[in-house]
Amino acid sequence: MKLLFAIVALLALAFLCADISAVKTSWPELVGETLEEAKAQILEDRPDAVIKVQPEHSPVTYDYRPSRVIIFVNKDGNVAETPAAG
């Protein structure tokens, strides 16, 4: 019985890990795109995302929030750095 429980627990853990790894957490392909294009793509990939927009090189907090995606934009309104969750 203990062996069966261990096998079920391992399978459940493997399923959870596989599910987590499928979640997109960064968008390097959006660098140079417009803010609106970036927002649309991120929300398509991650409907749970809470998007924050910051000017390029601005300070941010270092608390970790898995659903938060910060988009840094340059003076032209284009994505300046890779948007990433966290």
Swiss-Prot record:
One GO biological process term: response to wounding
Domain of life: Eukaryota
Signal peptide (from-to): 1-22
Family affiliation: Belongs to the protease inhibitor I13 (potato type I serine protease inhibitor) family.
Major location (coarse): secreted
KW Transferase (keyword) present: no
Record organism: Lumbricus terrestris
A Pfam family: potato_inhibit
Keyword field: Protease inhibitor, Secreted, Serine protease inhibitor, Signal
Name of this protein: Chymotrypsin inhibitor
GO cellular component: extracellular region
